Amino acid sequence: MSETNDVNDAIKHFPRLRARTLRFGCGAPRSAQTVGDGSRALFLRSDGPEDLVTALWLSWFDESGEHHETKLADPRELLGATADSEDVPAEEKARRERAREGGTGIVGYSADDDGNRIVFTINGRLFLTDIDWNDETGAPEPHTRELAGEWLDEDPAMYTPVLNPRIAPDGEHVLYTTGSYLMLVDIGGELGDRITAVYGVSVEDEDGNPAENTWKIGLAAVSYTHLRAHE
């Protein structure tokens, strides 16, 4: 009789447990992507079976073949207490609803070809994680900072919201959409981060090199699809 009661009790609580764990997906790796030479992989994961705040992780092997996992970016470290009470743009909320995305924190990312630069958004802000590699230990040393924060604060009507950011293969630029325009972010340099509006994408650069703008054309197509979804 006790066993039957346990089964009935489990059935009774199953719907709520399934909802609290996002269909039992919390705490499990997701959105994995191999990078570099294929020996490393980026992925997202929260800290527990009922933790909704997802962080960015790296799976890698050392010279002896031992496997390691390193947390690259943690929303709670970047935002503090506000990481548990998200304030995302309406357009991003709509995208998450369509994708049945119930997690918070870092729910998507874009990496360059080497896999050492990754961009993502948290609460509508744009972040960049740079990975340096320790010459002695061979371990990754991640550094995360906000990209172009001053620009976003100076003219939010022009430069926000930050939606669907994608980093260039060489890791030097980021393209995102505001829902109305494409925005190009130049990372770093002597003048710091800079944002410019992209009103058109040419198949050739100033020197007539068609390969230079290939990534922009692809991202423009992705962003166009993203824009149409909100019409």
For each of these PLM feature ranges, what is it?
Residues 1-228:
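Beta-propeller folds
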